């Protein structure tokens, strides 16, 4: 319960003093850096999930290897 009282007093202090500009500015600056990085990390995962595992050259190499192995047997 004491931490809630301290938090209310701290926020009230920030609202009436000039330090509030620096505090809220630092929070906003951090949020502006954090939000785009979170959004981009989620979109990268989606793109990676949709991307095909093999590129065309790898598929061709796999088919060629299977063909050569079948000739050996």
Curated annotation (Swiss-Prot):
Main localization (coarse): secreted
InterPro entries: Antimicrobial_4
Residue ranges listed under propeptide: 47-73
GO biological process, one term: killing of cells of another organism
Record keywords, A-Z: Cleavage on pair of basic residues, Cytolysis, Hemolysis, Membrane, Secreted, Signal, Target cell membrane, Target membrane
Function recorded in the entry: Amphipathic peptide with potent activities against Gram-positive bacteria (MIC=5.6-30.0 uM) and weaker activities against the tested Gram-negative bacteria (MIC=15 uM to >45 uM). It has high hemolytic activity against human erythrocytes. May act by disrupting the integrity of the bacterial cell membrane.
Protein name (record): Heterin-2
Species: Heterometrus spinifer
Lineage: Eukaryota, Metazoa, Ecdysozoa, Arthropoda, Chelicerata
